[in-house]
Swiss-Prot record:
Disulfide bonds: none annotated. It comes from the Eukaryota. One of its GO terms (molecular function) is chromatin binding. It comes from Xenopus laevis (African clawed frog). This is Mini-chromosome maintenance complex-binding protein.
């Protein structure tokens, strides 16, 4: 069996050992999965695995164990591969079984040939996910993950690449591809392990730069093809996952080899139905889009490095929740003051911003998403600087965020909705392909007079559907397919927003800083990292807590609402009851209470009265209706 640390530096050797021991029993695959699961159970073990998010690809040893935190952007068609194959020694006729799992290329010695007709060959199926870094991931999240793994990754970065390092840009501009065979003199031959009729691992051209398909413009980081062998039905597009797998970056995966003979190829080119464009999309250069053969893959409940991976079950998570709930009142008070300063002294708007930040879709009743709380902050300065600075503040306390200026040009030119490209057989990403709990700030203060074209109208409609139904209708040309989402949408506007919202608060600044950018910068500078971490933990934890209402409180709320309708039948509607229930739920959670109390119900009513009174005091601002 491999040495203590060989499970990271040489995982295929571990697999080989288990395969040799257990192949006769047929349970070697389960033993491999159990082995790596056990290795990753320790508190420090996951951090000891080099992370592709932090370590440059050219510093990672090929065929070593790596991890990757990412979002599933697309799922390709399932593919067949040779899970077990038999080779024949051309000198001695000796036959040997090999495993093809966790590999793109079959390994064999120079004198060995794969027997394609062997009855002992086993054809298996695997799924390929196209994964990208979490869209809009906040810098503090990246820094926290990096600092937690950097010390332990250093030992793995001592690998010296056998080729000169090339940047992403240099890889995109490569010249004619090297088509030399991968099994030179003295090297073991490596054959592709995909079975006949399925995908080739060769693009038709090396000169065209592949589209890495990031949903948001300006995003950086690696995209990866994740080969998943078990349980792929439990994952879906837009899930955040953490993959532990074997890194495959062999140049043969992206080399053009038109002279592949029958001996060196396990694919029959005549059976290959892929178009050239599809080959480019599905088989990009491994130096740009490495492959990871998943050994263990976890779906992440959240992307907050300050929280335990799960809030259920472990003593560590129970202790964390207990400790944070003990100081939740103090943290809430400090966060309220922090956001009040960011909102120019408006404490009421800060109250609503807090409950917006911890809101989440916790269930769906038919098509209605329960728990969402889209906030429209009206009365914002028209120049857009305030909204962008507010976004920078929020980016410091939420794990993922994106700022979208709603200019006419952006609405008409940007692609919001992902669409299926049938020529390349891939899902082209759009701005609204975001992971759960992403904060999306829509800045309407920059919306000027102009004409929305057809694309612009579709984009506005998509935003409305996102806000109202928490879904995005992906474009599959011949039909639309609904993808449910869980996005916290904050709309800043001068007057009433053209988009729907669950609640609208009119901003009433209590101060007018002469230099707004300097003021916001000073606010962040004065906030200690330890305090910001408390805010981050507070927001992350409270949106994951369970909540309930007792029968007694339910009856009291019903009676109270009936009385409210009697006293003011003209202005109290069913929508008001729904909003009050949502606000009271979020107010309770923001105070660390997982059930509604009479006091919180009355507090919610008080906040709603204060919010509505602002619209009665001032009906018009700058000619726009409030």
């Amino acid at each position: 069996m491999a040495g203590v640390e060989d499970w990271i530096s040489a995982p295929l050797a571990v697999v080989q050992g288990l395969f040799s021991q257990r192949q006769a029993n047929g349970d070697w695959e389960k033993n491999v999965t159990d082995y790596f699961h056990d290795k990753l159970q320790g508190n420090r073990s996951p951090a000891s695995v080099p992370c592709l998010n932090d370590v440059p690809l050219h510093y990672l040893k090929p065929n070593s164990l790596v991890r990757f935190r990412c979002m599933v952007q697309d799922m390709f068609d399932p593919e067949f591969y040779m899970g077990v194959y038999e080779t024949v020694d051309t000198n001695t006729s000796a036959r040997v079984l090999h495993f093809g799992k966790y590999r793109d290329l079959a390994e064999s010695l120079p004198q060995q040939e794969v027997d394609l007709d062997s009855r002992r060959n086993v054809t298996c199926e695997r799924q390929t996910f196209y994964c990208v870094p979490v869209p809009g991931e906040s810098p503090w999240v990246k820094d926290a993950y990096t600092s937690s793994s950097q010390a332990r990754a250093c030992a793995s970065t001592s690998y010296t690449p056998s080729r000169q390092k090339r940047s992403y840009e240099e890889d995109e501009d490569v010249g004619p591809c090297d088509t030399r065979t991968s099994h030179g003199l003295g090297e073991p031959k490596r054959l592709e392990t995909e079975a006949a009729g399925l995908q080739q691992n060769q693009p038709s051209s090396c000169s065209s730069a592949p589209d890495l398909n990031f949903p948001l413009p300006g995003e950086k980081g690696p995209a990866c093809l994740i080969k998943v062998y078990e349980g792929w039905d439990s994952f879906k597009v837009n899930d955040i996952i953490e993959v532990y797998g074997i890194l495959s970056v062999d140049p043969a995966l992206s080399a053009v080899n038109e002279d592949r003979d029958a001996v060196s190829a396990l694919l029959d080119p005549s059976d290959n139905m892929e178009t050239l464009e599809e080959q480019r999309a599905h088989c990009p250069p491994a130096s740009l889009v490495p492959r990871i053969h998943s050994v263990v893959t976890w779906k992440l409940q959240h992307n907050n490095p300050l929280l335990p991976g799960t809030l259920q079950g472990t003593e560590e998570s129970k202790l964390f929740v207990s400790n944070l709930l003990c100081e939740v009142s103090a943290v809430r008070a400090e966060l309220l003051g922090f956001l009040s300063h960011a909102l120019l002294g408006d404490s009421l708007a800060a109250e609503y911003l807090i409950i917006h930040l911890i809101s989440t879709v916790y269930a769906r009743r038919d098509v209605l998403p329960l728990g969402k709380f889209t906030l429209n902050l009206s009365g914002c300065p028209r120049n857009g600087i305030f909204s962008e600075l507010l976004y920078r503040i929020l980016q410091q306390i939420v794990p993922a965020a994106h700022y979208l200026p709603m200019t006419i040009e952006n609405m008409n030119k940007l692609r919001f909705i992902p669409h299926k490209d049938y020529n390349a057989n891939r899902l082209r990403s759009g701005l609204l392909q975001l992971s759960a709990h992403t904060s999306l700030l829509l800045d309407e203060t920059l919306l000027e007079q102009g004409q929305l074209d057809t694309a612009g109208v579709h984009n506005v409609t998509a935003l409305g559907n996102l806000i109202t139904w928490q879904k995005v209708d992906y474009d599959f040309s011949y039909h639309r397919m609904e993808f449910p989402c869980n996005i916290n949408v904050l709309v800043t506007s001068e007057g009433r927003s053209l988009l729907p919202s669950d609640c609208r608060v009119h901003l009433q600044p209590q101060m007018t800083p002469p230099n707004l950018e300097q003021y916001m910068g000073a606010l962040l500078s004065a906030s200690l990292p330890s305090l910001l971490n408390k805010f981050r933990s507070y927001i992350g934890l409270l949106r994951l807590l369970d909540y309930s209402i007792s029968d007694e409180i339910t009856k009291a709320v019903e009676d109270d609402f009936v009385e409210m309708r009697k006293n003011d039948p003209q202005s109290i509607s069913a929508d008001d009851l729904h909003r009050l229930l949502v606000v009271s739920r979020l107010l309770s959670l923001s105070s660390g209470q997982t059930t509604l109390s009479r006091e919180m119900w009355l507090r919610a009513k008080q906040l709603e009265q204060q919010r509505k009174s602002r619209f009665r005091e001032q009906k018009h601002v700058n000619g726009n209706e409030l």
